[in-house]
From Swiss-Prot:
Top-level EC class: transferase
Name the UniProt record assigns to this protein: N-acetylmuramate alpha-1-phosphate uridylyltransferase
Family stated for the protein in its record: Belongs to the nucleotidyltransferase MurU family.
Binding site for Mg(2+): D108, D213
Lineage: Bacteria, Pseudomonadati, Pseudomonadota, Betaproteobacteria, Neisseriales
Cofactors: Mg(2+)
Length: 231
């Protein structure tokens, strides 16, 4: 089974750190941020990893190589300057991801989401489900949330009455979900997901453990403290 780590972002809110270093390679407790994902994916049984990149992508390839240092095999999906957004990046990488459900992880989060359980979920994804998402409590920078999670584990696009949760950036997808996106085109993920939700094709679960969106310098410092204690 394959997993994809999204690593094509410019990291504007991290400047000037990201002017010379791509965000996935920023140090978090002695290890590049993306390295935490690679280690945990390997432990969970994901050994075929696809990584997309745009900004300073050559540095990512030079640092991670073929993945052997982490015990995995890495294939890269380069994108043009500016990137293709999340859905566009996944669509471009489909030839590397194969025909089975795959896991996608945002490269700029620090989390202890159970990737072993994710492996099992991907292996047994019901035929009528095209995506399975991990949702978390809303952080201060996203107080209203993104989607709502119903008692039957279905995920809905409407957020009403304070029932919203935040998408963690970790999800399992069927490749067919991206068939309508032409390779090389720019496309956001949220509209694709909302379309699938309206057809009752998205399930999810709430994660209550460690999750941090490492999107600012302040949160990078928080990640360094968390990861230092975590390891």
């Amino acid at each position: 089974m394959k997993a994809m780590i999204l690593a094509a972002g410019r990291g504007e809110r991290m400047r000037p750190l990201t002017d010379t270093t791509p965000k996935p390679l920023l140090d978090v407790a002695g290890k590049p941020l993306i390295g935490w994902h690679l280690c945990r994916l390997k432990q969970a049984g994901f050994t075929e990893i696809v990584i997309n990149h745009a900004w300073l992508g050559r540095q990512i390839e030079d640092a991670l190589g073929d993945g052997s240092a982490y015990g995995v095999n890495i294939a890269y999906s380069p994108e043009p300057a500016g990137g293709l957004e999340t859905a566009g990046g996944i669509a471009q990488a489909l030839p590397l991801l194969g025909g089975q459900p795959f896991l996608v992880v945002n490269g700029d989060v620090l989390t202890d989401i159970d990737f072993t359980a994710a492996f099992q979920t991907a292996s047994s994804l019901p035929e009528h489900i095209s995506a399975h998402l991990w949702l978390v409590e809303n952080p201060p920078h996203n107080p209203d949330g993104d989607f709502s999670l119903l008692p039957d584990s279905s995920v809905r696009p409407e957020v009403n009455g304070g029932n919203g949760l935040t998408f963690s950036g970790v999800g399992i997808y069927r490749p067919e979900m991206f068939d309508g996106i032409e390779a090389g085109s720019v496309a956001k993920l949220a509209p694709v997901l909302r379309g699938e939700m309206r057809q009752n094709r998205v399930s999810g679960q709430k994660h209550t453990g460690l999750w941090l969106d490492v999107g600012t310098v302040c949160r990078l410092k928080e990640a360094q403290a968390l990861a230092g204690a975590w390891k």
